[in-house]
């Protein structure tokens, strides 16, 4: 009981709380009020305004992406990313068993089938070893039979591959792989990207939690053509609600921006639309919040890492608890701190 009380007192001291300690609290310590007031004063609060463009440009610069496109949620960003990657109804998508429902929902909107694979204990993200083993047992590469299957106005695929990966048992196309950088920790993304290239599978990174995290100095969400980020209130930086797609293909990014703004062709008075479009654009007032938050992102990441170091120091002498240790060549924003209990299964057996 004494150890339990000491731990509770320690946690309260870290956060300066006497009562309840929430899992996540957004911090507004910069220009948030000034930027929000500017939106209100100018009346540009909806999906058109300078903060939308500024946020996209600043995020592209920060992450090293060729282009960034904001959305109204991280789930929207994942949904749009999968459509742009060419995922269609009845396709299969490789993802990880330790996940969040948003990833599966985005697949379900399209009518695709998730294939759940194991995670690495070292990263809590998709295991390339499990992925390789599953592909060797269950998959084969052959001619892509789904190109041109839909009318152009209904097909969101951008740059379809001539060849595709297929499940030998179900006959379905395995179109994409969605690894998640769980808790902000980078997965073994280079190995996953190599497997995707070898098997003609599109890589769509779920970087919802990992803004500020890098692998070998490269920001998460930029190892494939498309990555998705979330700015929900529990993330390292927030826009209240929102998401973003990161693109390593400038042309694809421009296409995404067009599709997410109702696919409207610019014209002074006519309303012409060349595709089935989506109203997925982030409002200017949310982007204003994002601009201010991004200015302090490195400070917030440093704060999270400091708290993690204090936790590790406090628990280092507690038997049966292992803290997450960053694998070589990775830098995690430590969006969430997790522990593992190696003997837990034995204890409950």
Q: What do these predicted regions represent?
A:
Residues 124-239, 244-246, 251:
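Active-site phosphate-binding strand-loop segment of PLP-dependent enzymes
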Residues 63-65, 71-83, 89, 94-128, ...:
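Substrate-binding/gating loop at the entrance of the active-site cleft, primarily
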């Amino acid at each position: 009981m004494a150890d339990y009380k000491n731990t509770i007192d320690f946690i309260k001291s870290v956060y300066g709380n006497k009562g309840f300690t929430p899992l996540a609290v957004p911090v507004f310590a910069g220009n948030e009020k000034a930027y929000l007031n500017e939106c209100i004063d100018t009346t540009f609060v909806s999906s058109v305004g300078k903060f939308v463009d500024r946020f996209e440009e600043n995020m592209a610069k920060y992450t090293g992406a060729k282009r960034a496109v904001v959305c109204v949620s991280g789930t929207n960003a994942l949904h749009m990313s999968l459509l742009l990657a060419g995922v269609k109804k009845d396709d299969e998508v490789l993802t990880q068993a330790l996940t969040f429902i948003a990833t599966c929902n985005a697949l379900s909107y399209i009518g695709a089938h998730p294939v759940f694979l194991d995670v690495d204990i070292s990263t809590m993200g998709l295991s390339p070893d499990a992925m390789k083993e599953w592909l060797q047992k269950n998959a084969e590469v052959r001619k892509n039979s789904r190109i041109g299957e839909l009318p152009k106005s209904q097909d969101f695929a951008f740059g379809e591959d001539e060849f595709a990966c297929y499940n030998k048992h179900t006959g379905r196309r395995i179109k994409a792989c969605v690894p998640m950088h769980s808790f902000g920790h980078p997965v073994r993304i280079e190995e996953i990207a190599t497997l995707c290239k070898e098997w003609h599978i599109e890589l769509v990174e779920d970087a919802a939690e990992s803004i500020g995290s890098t692998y070998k100095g490269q920001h998460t969400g930029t190892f494939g053509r498309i990555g998705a980020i979330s700015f929900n209130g529990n993330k390292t930086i927030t826009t209240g609600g929102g998401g973003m797609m990161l693109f390593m293909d400038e042309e694809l990014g421009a296409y995404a921006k067009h599709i997410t703004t109702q696919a409207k062709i610019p014209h002074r008075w006519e309303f012409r639309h060349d595709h089935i479009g989506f109203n997925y654009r982030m409002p200017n007032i949310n982007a204003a919040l994002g601009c201010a938050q991004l200015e302090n992102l490195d400070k917030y990441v440093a704060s999270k890492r400091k708290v993690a170091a204090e936790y590790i120091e406090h628990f280092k002498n507690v038997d049966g608890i292992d803290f997450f240790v960053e694998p070589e060549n990775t830098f995690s924003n430590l969006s969430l701190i997790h522990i593992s209990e190696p003997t837990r299964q034995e204890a409950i057996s």
